[in-house]
Structure formats: C-alpha cells, structure tokens
C-alpha cells in the first residue's frame, strides 16, 4: 500500500470508516482523525489530502463542529463530502441554508450531471446516479469556486476551486449506491492529491 497519507476528518457522519476503506482500496494509506485534532498534529503527518466527512449537523448552527480555518491556508487539497462540502463553502465565504422540498432537499438515488472537465470527474460519464442525504444546501458558493455538478432539484451538487485544490460534493461517493463514486475518490487521490503507485 502507498504510504502517502490521506487524513479523513471525522465530523460525525455514519460513513466515515467506509470513506477510509474506499481510500485504502485505491492503494493509499489513510487515517481517520477527529475534527478536533490540532492542525499542527495533522500537518505533521504530511498528508497529501484531507477528506471532510458528512455529519448530522448544520454548519450555520452555533454548536456545529468546525475545522481550524488555517487548514485552508496549508496548501493541502481538500475533498468535502456532504457536511464536509457545506463546511468548505461556509468557511470560505459561501452561504449554507436549510433546504426544503422546493430548494434541494434530497435523499436517495439521484440522477446527477457532471462537468467532466473538472479533475474530480475526469474520465467519468457526464451523467450517473449518486446517493444524496442532505437537508441543507449551498445557496451561495464561495468566490473562486465553480459549480461542477447538478441534479434536477439541486443546482450545486458539486463545487471546486481547482487553483487551490478544494472540492466539495453534496452526495456520498463512498456508498455503493453512487455509481463511479470510488472512481471519483481515486481521481481526488491521484489527479489532485498527486498520490503515486
């Protein structure tokens, strides 16, 4: 196994260990750490990327778990999944709000459309099924980010700032219900995190 390290930051999501398993299945070493781990300790591991997990909270609530904002200045690529995606948006100047049935609340298998010019979706189909489970959505994405995936109900299923290496997806690529999810994770590891065999 490749001993370059990916750190999965745990924000309380139910699929955290599954994310780690998918990373390892792609041949990259991975450790799951609580979001409260001091940034200096995380950076001492010399990660080639961070993956922020999902979680049951809303980023705009006062007691919601957050990451040290200095992480975004560390020069390390970040992939946010569900809550992790919203966390990226929230910290970098976007706006996350509660969804309702008319504004992008999604649960279950969802037909999703991708911009395959984004490194995260390189070599993948422009349309596939993903597994959604979110009650919040990004009403406004941060400056410098592009919208790179959407569904019929949600205009911003995925965002990216390729210059800084920040990527976020509202869906769960780690679960089997998401077609090509493991391929997307592999792209993060090898195309963005620059892991090598």
Listing of model-derived features with the role each one plays in the protein:
Residues 30-32, 96, 147:
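Generic structural signal for residues in well-ordered beta-strands
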Residues 21-27, 44-123, 129, 179-186:
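Cysteine-nucleophile active-site neighborhood
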Residues 116-163:
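Catalytic beta-strand/loop cores that center a nucleophilic Ser/Cys/Thr
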Residues 195-197:
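Conserved small/polar residues in nucleotide/adenosyl-binding loops
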Residues 27-43:
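A short, well-structured beta->alpha microelement
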Residues 146-150, 154-167, 175-191:
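C-terminal and late-domain segments of enzyme folds
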Residues 5-26:
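Short, charged N-terminal beta->alpha structural module
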């Amino acid at each position: 196994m490749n001993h370059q390290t990916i750190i999965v930051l745990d924000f309380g999501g139910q699929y955290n260990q599954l994310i780690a398993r998918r990373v390892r299945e792609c041949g990259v070493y991975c450790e799951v750490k609580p979001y409260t781990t001091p940034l200096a300790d995380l950076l001492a591991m010399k990660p080639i990327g961070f993956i922020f997990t999902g979680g049951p909270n809303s980023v705009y609530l006062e007691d919601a778990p957050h990451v040290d904002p200095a992480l975004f200045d560390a020069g390390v690529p970040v992939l946010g999944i569900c809550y992790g995606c919203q966390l990226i948006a929230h910290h970098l100047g976007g706006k996350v709000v509660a969804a309702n049935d008319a504004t992008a609340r999604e649960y279950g298998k969802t037909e999703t459309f991708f911009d395959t010019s984004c490194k995260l979706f390189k070599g993948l189909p422009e349309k596939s099924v993903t597994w959604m489970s979110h009650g919040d959505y990004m009403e406004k994405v941060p400056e410098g980010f592009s919208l790179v995936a959407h569904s019929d109900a949600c205009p911003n299923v995925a965002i990216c700032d390729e210059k800084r290496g920040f990527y976020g997806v509202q869906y769960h690529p780690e679960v089997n219900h998401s077609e090509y999810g493991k391929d997307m994770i592999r792209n993060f590891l090898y195309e963005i995190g620059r892991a090598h065999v």
